[in-house]
Each structure stands twice: as C-alpha cells, then as structure tokens.
Amino acid sequence: MRNLLRGMLVVICCMAGIVMADEKNILVTSGSDRATPIAVVPFGFQGGAVLPDDMAEIIGNDLRNSGYYSPIPKQNMISQPSQPSEIIFRDWKAVGAQYMMVGSIVPAGGRLQVQWALFNVATEQKVADGSVSGTTEQLRDMAHYISDQSFEKLTGIKGAFSTRLLYVTAERFSEKNTRYTLQRSDYDGARAVTLLQSREPILSPRFAPDGKRIAYVSFEQKRPRIFMQNIDTGRREQITNFEGLNGAPAWSPDGNRLAFVLSKDGNPDIYVMNLGSRQITRVTAGPGINTEPYWGKDGSTIYFTSDRGGKPQIYKTSAGGGGAERVTFVGNYNANPKLSADEKTLVMIHRQDGFTNFKVAAQDLQRGSVKILTDSTLDESPTVAPNGTMVIYATRQQGRGVLMLVSINGRVRLPLPTAQGEVREPSWSPYLN
C-alpha cells in the first residue's frame, strides 16, 4: 500500500494518509475543453483610501478555480465600466467574453456598500445582481459571497467559495525541534489563523458537519490520540486513548458519530463511536489494514482503504459492520476515498503500476472509468469542495510539501499560498451559510 506500512505510520504517524497516486491507462489530465470566458471588471470605488483587497480579482479567481470559467485579463479589457448604464457590450464581444460583471463600492456610515451586476454579453441581458455591505475587513467575505451567488445563478450549483480549509504545517528548526501548527484559512489559502500548536505531530484534521467543531489526531505525550475541539472557544476534549493506533477520524453526516481507526484488538480496523453515549462499534474485522473511513451522504455506508486483497484498494461497508464490497479495480493502488456531493464520483489517490507516481484521480462510480486530475507524482490527502467542483490535495514541489487545487473537470491546477514549512493534511469545510 504505497507501502501500507508507511501507510501505517501514516495511519499512525500520518493518519490522514495511506494515500498517494499515479497515472493510469485512461490518462485524461487537464483541459481537454475550454472554460467559459468571463470578464470581472475592476469594481469602482468612491472613497479616498486604498482598499486592502481587490474584489474583482478575488471573484475572478474564484470563478476560475471552479474550472467552469476563464477570466478575461484586465489588460485585455477595452473599457472598465462600474455601472450597468456604462456598459458597451461590443467591447466585451470583441474580447470574447460570454459573461461580464460590473460593480461599485461606496462608503456608507463606516461600512462599505457593494452593488454588482452580471450580464450575458451575447443577449445583453442581466443574469443576476445584488448588493452586500460590510466592513473593510470583510471585503474578502463579500467577494466570496458574490462569487457564490454568481456561480449558482450561472450553473445551478451552489457556490463553495465562502468555505474554509484546515491544514497542518511542520517547521523543522533542528533534528529534535519541529513545530506543528493546525491552521484554518479561506478555501483559497488566504487569511490563515492558528487553531493549535504542538511540538508533536498533528494529523487528520476534519471539520464537523456544523463547521463549528473539528476532530484531529495529536501525538501529545508521545502517543496518538483523537481530540475534538470547538473552533470558536478553543475548548477541546479527548475522544480516544486506546493502546496502539488511534487515527483517521471521520464525522458522520449528522455529526453525531465519529468513525476512526484503532488497533487495540490487533490489526488496524475501523470503529464508530456514538458521541452521545460514547459507545463504540467495530465496523471491520479480518486480515490486513483497514483505514481512512469516509461516510456516504446518508450515514449508512462507510468507504475505506484496505489491503485485504494484497494491495490497497477502496471498499465500502455498512456503518453498522458486516461484509465489504470492493469499489476500485483500475490500478494497483487506490486509497483515501472522498465522494463528490452527488456521490457519482469517487476522488482518491491512485497508482496504475510500479512503486511511484501517486496522483489524484476521479472514478465515475457508474461507469468505473478513472480520470487522472494531476501531473505530480507524490500526491496525498485529497479533500473535495462541498459542491464537488474542486479538490485540494497535498503534494511536493521543489522538495517542499505544498497544497494544490485542481478543478474536478481538470481544467485548472494551481498552488495555494500557505505558510512556511511543510504543508499537508488539507480538509475542506462544509457549507458555512
């Protein structure tokens, strides 16, 4: 299992991951078709100060990151209207834009009032408009909100740009001195804040479905234990402290149960805890390593990684235990399952053959076909946006652990800005509004 024993130290010591992936014989990577051109014109600002954030740039980046839209570069814009009445549609037809957005920002009573409108260039008809207000510090929030509204109006898919991201950084100062930091940021890596620091590893952070709590593995006191923490207050409590492995926490869709991996009875297996009663049920049993649980949407099914067949593959089973059904058959390594919002696509770490080249891939669960989404070779820990349009994953670039974003259609692939040190273990929040 990409050496499942590395996996176990990545289940014990990296319990977010027995994961990583490679190419495949279907090798479909990025960009076989074009994203829709859209122009997000710089918003007009009727104020004296310089704003700390460029709302139009943030909105354009959001729409680009989805893989659905390709923003027109600012330097290609023939005109820059800020009001609908100022739009000259032939200018936007000339640069190939199919949609265009204008907006204005007006100071009002110590706050900023933002008006925006989105147009179909070909028909010259308004598609959507709205207003939002907030403080200067909330400019990014307002921009992500406008992105969400616009994306849903254009595609019928709820926008996921106002969501958050968890990840872990590791800064090594000397052989025996490493600082691990659990961070929360905007989905695009901006505005990172520290939730926890430790001299021991922090692994597998996961948002609860309410977005207010997280679970993670901490190696405080030199052994893995699972903790639950309130994001706002910082208050936390220990959930497991069994002998051996305690790792890979995964919240049920209703937030009332937590699946995780324990080795207290021998082999690493998946268990489920009722968080109300703290009663634990064993879900898997038998030979091999069973790890990386991930819940189906209805809370009755758990997907997981197992080497019971000799090499790591993805299986599914009832959350109450019982027989398991194999899900993946393409490639000699498939691990770390995540589902798209509609549960039609399985995102995973995939390897076709050999011992290297671990890539993020997406399997169509109806057809069984697998599409490679990345071109790197040491990918791990994929996490999927709540609307299923984007994947963030950890990989290595120039000898450093970094986070990357790829659209599920493969059109966009880009690095996320993060802090210094090794960055790993990303986890996407649910919708927060």
Swiss-Prot record:
Subunit structure of this chain's protein: The Tol-Pal system is composed of five core proteins: the inner membrane proteins TolA, TolQ and TolR, the periplasmic protein TolB and the outer membrane protein Pal. They form a network linking the inner and outer membranes and the peptidoglycan layer.
Disulfide bonds: none
PANTHER family in the cross-refs: PROTEIN TOLB, PROTEIN TOLB HOMOLOG
The keyword Cell cycle belongs to this UniProt entry's keyword annotation: yes
A GO BP entry: cell division
Protein family (similarity comment): Belongs to the TolB family.
Role according to the record: Part of the Tol-Pal system, which plays a role in outer membrane invagination during cell division and is important for maintaining outer membrane integrity.
GO CC terms of this entry: periplasmic space
Name of the protein: Tol-Pal system protein TolB
Signal peptide limits: 1-21
Cellular compartments annotated: Periplasm
HAMAP family assigned to the protein according to its UniProt record, in alphabetical order: TolB
Keywords of this entry: Cell cycle, Cell division, Periplasm, Signal
Organism name: Pseudomonas fluorescens (strain Pf0-1)
